[in-house]
Regions:
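Domain-scale recognition of functional cores that engage charged ligands
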Residues: 1-153
Length: 153
């Protein structure tokens, strides 16, 4: 892959861990001769013609961001993603694969597969988690909002 323009790496301003990850990726990019820049996600701008820019109004041609697509879709600039000319590394369609709602579908079509756990859609999320079950929200990061009931309760 040939990258002739700056490659931006973005993370949330207050996430030290994500900044460390993007700094490492920037270092790798620089080692292979790709000019790279860091930008905080909160500092990415959008021009009137739908172009993503940095704080100096420079176009962001390539972007790797450590921020979930499902959050971006609901942010003010989320609607600009489909029409913009920024190349995202981790394309927006990956949000489908990161959605835990795909797990029951995989189980339905591949029941008993050794790499899958039995998964079902929760028809009553307000109800307590039964013994021996785990409840995961459709969108979850780093184990957040997971409910677990051991077999013993």
């Amino acid at each position: 892959m040939q990258v002739n323009q700056p490659f931006y790496f973005a993370s949330m301003k207050d996430s030290v861990e994500d900044k460390g990850t993007t700094d490492y990726l920037r270092l790798v990019a620089e080692k292979v001769g790709i000019e790279s820049r860091h930008i905080d996600i909160e500092d990415i701008g959008l021009t009137s013609d739908g172009r993503f820019v940095d704080l100096e109004d420079r176009w962001i041609p390539h972007l790797f961001k450590l921020h979930a697509w499902e959050f971006i879709f609901h942010e003010p600039f989320g609607t600009a993603i489909a029409q913009c000319d920024t190349q995202f590394f981790e394309p927006a369609w990956k949000a489908i694969l990161s959605n835990k709602g795909i797990l029951p579908l995989l189980w339905e079509f591949n029941q008993g597969h050794p790499n899958l756990l039995a998964s079902h859609l929760d028809t009553d999320p307000g109800k307590a988690v039964p013994k021996g079950w785990v409840r995961k929200p459709f969108f979850s990061r780093e184990g957040a909002n997971i409910e677990l009931q051991t077999a013993d309760g």
